[in-house]
Amino acid sequence: VLSAALFAWLLGAYYLIQPTREAFGISAGPVYELLWTGTAVATLLATPIYGWAVARFPRDRFATGLYLGAALALAGFWIAHGQTEGALRRTVGYVFYVFVSTLAVFATTLFWALMADGHRPDTARRLFGVISVGGTLGALGGSALVDALSDTLSPRDMILLGAFGYASSLFLLRPLLRSLPNTAPKTTGAHAPPLREALAGARLFAKSPYLLGIGLFLAGQTLAATFLYIESREFLFHALPTRDVAESVAQANTVARTSFFARINLAYNAIALLVQLFLVGRLVRWLGLGALLASL
């Protein structure tokens, strides 16, 4: 129960700030793709640091630091966005976009690492589906809250709500870590440098047809999703402009963008929940996992 509740809380916090991230990012207009490049570079740079920190610190201390650090950083963005204007404010929004995109990767990765360390394989098979449903419910709640409050709170204020969400997740994280039987790292010897471990992982990936197949599947899926994603943002950039317009119009259009993305997230997660609960198991039994993935 605590695992599902924590995942719901974390995804709820993320979906409180995700529409604001998108609304700010669209302001980049023709150079929107650079934000994706910035996210890729930031993720690549952060990965060895993340690997080093996971190897160096106990998981409970590192998890606390990551989620609390995320909350403090979001509070900093809330302050910075309120104290700037014009091009400088847009720049803060672009940095916020890259930060949130990178945070989403590591916050989710860390959660599932904790789950993998804390549950035996037989227990994991029974519980991980339930935990995933909990995350979807949290995403629904966060999206619904943004949509409900979009006429009352500004997109900037959603950042502060997200900061509160990540900070308050510690009240679920600490008892969860105490209840899991195996959250400590399994080895106590010297750890290999993160770069060496990354290279070893790359060699293993290149030698395994199974891993290569998964990689190609994910690459193709991501390529198609990226194309649709960028095209939809290009449409909104022109439909709801925030550049070269009056400040009041820019603010109103930013609010409209935020509400739009919240509703998209709400619909997406509602469909995902229905599929998780009623369709996935049946489709796997009827079609087989390979055919189901190919159809996607």
Language model regions located:
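Membrane-embedded alpha-helical bundles of multi-pass transporters/translocases
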Residues: 1-187, 192, 198-296
